[in-house]
């Protein structure tokens, strides 16, 4: 494959192997059922045409059948905590011990420290092909922390960045305080959401009511850390499903984690998933961190996986995504800002199949994250010309052995990652 200049805008790509889920209805297929290759024409950084093809088209960059995805989505990160593992190691296993270690590390969170770590995370994500990233930011009081504004000031390197105020549920106990938090988030500018940490250790139904009501009044979407535990008595998702059946929420809701669904029975989970589907709620699974933190005891092999019910959610019609969650901090000492690593983890932990043609949607589906119908067709005419090309892979091995990639953002080749220079990139 001949590489084009990284400076000049591309006119388009030819003979790209796109995933079946992202193609329009009626797209032609080969005898073996695979979709026909595609031409994508670009104009002014956007897609001007999508057409099936068998032959290279003059004037377009010929990919010769290389696997090609839309820009990748990172639906759940923590830019305020990232890259702190060298100074922040929990003394016990599990989620609550990691939270305690994180609080101990906060004394180091100067503006310069946050800017340095978060900028490095965004640079890695961009080099891996991420074009949309949502970061939760911890709020410790009703006032916005320094990290909230510091992350807003970052040079995102072509990534659309969203911020979620991650607020402990008890801070919503007082309706006046709940209103003040929601107002502060709403006044923070575009792409800001309200969130909450909802766990059996801090459960409060009245606070949940205040959280949803204040978000609705201020026209805020929600992204909740909810039921991040393997407990049959956790109440977050059960309460939310029942509440939505009586009081539909006007915005979009994402529920991150949901590990407790895997601790109960199928009969308990089914009505919850039906309600989530009926109200357009998205379920975000976070396999790397949940595998490390759930059923965790030092010196003991875990018996439970800690992954939410991905297959059952998909069967019920719930939109689903996979996220990296924590990267190199007290919650997850490893991790990366490469969604392919997350999907590979999901492949084994959740026993996913048909990875490229169907489950790649878990790391690309902006509509599932935002709730916006405008994001539903990534290759539609008028969509931004953002693609990630995997020249050395095939649909049977992908996402493994697929570190080499080429990133096109708004119609320009922005990053090149090859085997010999694994993290090299050109801008």
Where would I find each of the regions flagged by the language model?
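Histidine-centered catalytic micro-motifs
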Residues: 70-82, 137, 221-230
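Alpha-helical scaffold segments that flank or form the walls of functional sites
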Residues: 68, 85-136, 142-156, 180-186
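His/Asp/Glu-enriched, well-ordered alpha-helical/loop segment
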Residues: 242-253, 304-390
């Amino acid at each position: 494959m001949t590489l084009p200049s990284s400076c000049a805008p591309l006119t388009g790509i030819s003979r790209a192997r796109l995933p079946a889920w992202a193609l329009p209805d009626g797209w032609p297929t080969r005898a073996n059922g695979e979709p026909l290759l595609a031409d994508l024409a670009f104009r002014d950084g956007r897609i001007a045409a999508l057409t099936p093809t068998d032959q290279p088209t003059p004037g377009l960059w010929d990919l010769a059948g290389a696997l090609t995805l839309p820009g990748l989505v990172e639906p759940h990160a923590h830019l305020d905590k990232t890259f702190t593992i060298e100074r922040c190691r929990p003394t016990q296993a599990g989620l609550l011990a990691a939270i305690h270690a994180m609080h101990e590390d906060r004394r180091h969170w100067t503006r310069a420290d946050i800017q340095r770590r978060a900028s490095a995370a965004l640079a890695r994500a961009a080099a891996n092909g991420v074009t949309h990233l949502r970061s939760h930011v911890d709020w410790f009081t009703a006032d916005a922390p320094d990290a909230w504004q510091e992350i807003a000031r970052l040079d995102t390197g072509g990534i659309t960045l969203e911020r979620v105020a991650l607020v402990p549920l008890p801070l919503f106990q007082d309706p006046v305080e709940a209103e003040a938090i929601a107002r502060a988030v709403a006044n923070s500018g575009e792409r800001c959401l309200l969130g909450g940490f909802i766990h059996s250790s801090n459960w409060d139904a009245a606070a949940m009511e205040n959280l949803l009501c204040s978000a609705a009044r201020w026209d805020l979407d929600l992204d909740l850390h909810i039921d991040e535990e393997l407990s049959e008595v956790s109440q977050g998702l059960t309460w939310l499903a029942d509440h939505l059946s009586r009081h539909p929420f006007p915005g979009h809701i994402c529920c991150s984690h949901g590990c407790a669904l895997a601790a109960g029975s199928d009969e308990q989970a089914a009505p919850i998933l039906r309600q989530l589907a009926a109200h357009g709620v998205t379920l975000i699974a976070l396999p790397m961190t949940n595998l490390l933190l759930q059923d965790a005891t030092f010196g003991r092999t875990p018996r439970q996986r800690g992954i939410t019910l991905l297959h059952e959610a998909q069967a019920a019609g719930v939109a689903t995504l996979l996220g990296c969650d924590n990267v190199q901090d007290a919650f997850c000492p490893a991790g990366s800002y490469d969604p392919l690593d997350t999907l590979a983890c999901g492949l084994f932990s959740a026993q996913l199949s048909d990875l490229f043609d169907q489950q790649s949607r878990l790391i690309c589906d902006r509509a599932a994250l935002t709730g916006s119908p405008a994001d539903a067709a990534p290759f539609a005419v008028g969509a931004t010309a953002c693609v990630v090309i995997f020249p050395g892979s095939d649909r049977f091995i992908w996402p493994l052995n697929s570190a080499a990639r080429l990133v096109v953002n708004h119609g320009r080749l922005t990053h090149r990652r090859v085997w010999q220079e694994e993290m090299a990139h050109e801008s």
